[in-house]
Design a protein with these regions (language model features):
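Amphipathic alpha-helical protein-protein interaction segments
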Residues: 1-260, 284, 288-296, 301, ...
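Residue-level detector of buried hydrophobic side-chain packing
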Residues: 38, 147, 158, 237-239, ...
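Cysteine protease catalytic core and zymogen-processing segment of caspase-like enzymes
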Residues: 253-257, 290-296, 300-309, 342-347, ...
Length: 564
């Protein structure tokens, strides 16, 4: 059970097993805190691979002791798990847990020393995992509930936290949850173009996907939300996902059924498809599901509950950025691009072996015709639409060659409240360190240049952004579906100073993206909505229109971070 990821995931499982034996002893609250620590540890592994320079000022001896203690904790957690799987006596259970607690105290002492010697490192890797009471007081309000998921090889868990209570539920094992999530993901993204597919083949594939969609969506909704259906009402949902669930568009899931306590069978309680956005909305007959979750709920994703509390501490009292928005869009990826000075391009047309960025693109499922990246035609319109909403002198538009890595790493970005990247963003789950944003790969003369904003680059940025938008993310769900690519990128921007990040879970149709972004930015800049509320309003409005009703066109965009 104790995997490479870390000891805390194993410890959470142990505590939940103890909770089943001793439900009055608050083991479920301790397990939630362990789950929060596990997420901080997972991020550290990503950053180590990315070679992000975050360990400056930390005594190497302390880091060695930290690693040694983690190994001891892993071994002890394994032994305790084996013990609990049998028929241990009460004395055996108490003794084993005391040994584990003793090691945990020593581990926390080492972490405290690291925190003292390097506050920056500690703030990132140990974001002060909150107790249950702290989560309730610092993260939640009366209109919000926290849903935190943890997947394990033998079983998974869901914690539902309100300002006044905690409830915990056992979920199926990781393999079962991920198989259900994968099926839903494949069906919701079926509208994606498939290379070399004929019109007839596409029509047949879409018809099959549409026929299977409702059943798959209902199955996943029942699995993930069924146990808590009666608790959700119309509250804001703060979702801390795990593994494959990071790529589940919760916004598109149908409202969950109310679980029948007697039979265990989940049935759908007939409910109106209401919304606070409009007084009398009606269900969309064109939609493959009757009433998606987004209609009744604002949905916010979080790397962890503790990260949000840390974000709020970092942002408290920060002076607002002076300017409104900067948009980097429609970069130049290829020496064959029509925007290049042809003479200079011919002189530099040298064959290069596949670069690390191109290999990462292949791992992330980006369809490419030959070397290079496809131009995203509608990103230019996307940029123009956003800029039309901005007062003169309060925005900047960086198109073509100006949409460069140099521009993205410039201190000038710190002047803007909203930062929008309308270009390929790679979420690489096989090698999270290779996640990043693709900007102009050639200059005006056609000379190759470094245009990849890498994960470790983000940790050196100094932003004052209320929001960073990545409107064209792309990923591939490999055999092992993990969320490290998404977590690394969004957490990196938060570390750099962004209060929230909007990213896409798949490459959405260019035209649909431009349309959704138009509605999203109108909601923020014209109507004065908070980003989370503006995104929800844009998604609901897309769902209600026949042309855009399929969740593929709107559900892939998720907001991570602060919702206020």
């Amino acid at each position: 059970l104790a995997s490479k990821q870390n000891y805390y995931a194993a410890y959470a499982d142990v505590l939940m097993q103890l909770h089943q034996r001793e439900p009055a002893n608050a083991h479920d609250a301790a397990a939630l805190q362990a789950s929060e620590r596990a997420r901080a540890r997972s991020l550290l592994d990503i950053l180590a691979e990315a070679r992000a320079d975050i360990r400056q000022g930390v005594d190497p001896t302390l880091l060695d002791r930290e690693r040694t203690m983690q190994q001891q904790l892993n071994a002890k957690a394994d032994r305790l798990t084996q013990l609990l799987s049998g028929q241990p006596t009460e004395d055996q259970t108490i003794t084993a847990k005391k040994e584990l607690d003793r090691l945990l105290i020593q581990y926390r002492e080492i972490q405290s020393q690291i925190r003292t010697s390097s506050p920056k490192y500690a703030a990132l890797t140990q974001p002060g995992p909150l107790s249950l009471k702290e989560i309730q007081q610092q993260v939640l309000d009366e209109d919000s509930v926290l849903l935190e998921y943890a997947l394990g090889e033998q079983r998974g868990f869901l914690w539902l936290v309100t300002p006044a209570s905690i409830k915990s539920f056992e979920l199926p094992k990781r393999a079962e949850v991920e198989a259900t999530a994968r099926r839903f993901y494949e069906l919701v993204t079926a509208h994606r173009a498939v290379k070399f597919e004929t019109k007839h083949e596409r029509q047949a594939r879409l018809a099959k996907a549409t026929a299977e969609y409702s059943e798959a969506a209902r199955a996943l909704s029942d699995m993930l939300l069924g146990p808590v259906a009666a608790e959700l009402q119309k509250k804001r949902l703060l979702i801390v996902a795990d593994g494959a669930l990071q790529y589940v568009p919760f916004a598109a899931l149908p409202k969950p059924g109310i679980r029948d306590q007697g039979s265990g069978i989940s049935t759908l309680r007939i409910a109106d498809c209401g919304s606070r956005i409009e007084e009398s909305p009606i269900p969309n007959p064109q939609s493959p599901i009757g009433c998606p979750l987004i209609v009744d709920h604002e949905i916010v994703n979080l790397p962890s509950a503790s990260v949000l509390a840390a974000l709020r501490r970092e942002l408290a009292g920060r002076k607002p950025a002076a300017k409104t928005v900067v948009v980097l869009a429609d970069p130049v990826f290829s020496q064959n691009d029509e925007r290049i000075n042809r003479r200079g391009a011919e002189q530099s047309a040298i064959r290069h072996p596949p670069s690390a960025i191109e290999r990462s693109a292949e791992e992330s499922g980006i369809e490419r015709e030959g070397p290079g990246f496809p131009r995203l035609a509608y990103t230019r319109r996307e940029a123009e639409t956003i800029m039309a909403l901005v007062p003169e002198g309060k925005g900047m538009k960086a198109l073509d060659f100006q949409a460069s890595r140099a521009r993205a790493t410039s201190p000038d970005l710190g002047q803007y409240r909203l930062i929008h990247f309308a270009t390929h963003a790679i979420l690489n789950n096989q090698h999270p360190a290779l996640s990043g944003i693709v900007l102009s790969l050639v200059d005006e003369r056609g000379q190759p240049q470094d245009g990849f904003l890498r994960l470790h680059d983000l940790y050196n940025l100094n932003l004052s952004a209320d929001l960073v938008v990545l409107s064209a993310c792309q990923t591939a769900l490999g055999k092992e579906i993990k969320g490290e690519g998404l977590v690394g990128l969004t957490r990196g921007f938060m570390y750099a100073g962004a209060a929230r990040v909007v990213a896409s879970l798949w490459k959405v149709n260019d035209e649909a993206t431009a349309e959704l972004m138009r509605r999203f930015y109108q909601g923020m800049l014209r109507d004065g909505r908070r980003p989370a509320a503006a995104l929800r309003a844009a998604q609901v409005s897309m769902w209600k229109e026949k042309r855009w009703s399929a969740p593929f066109y709107w559900a892939g965009f998720v907001l991570q971070g602060e919702w206020r």
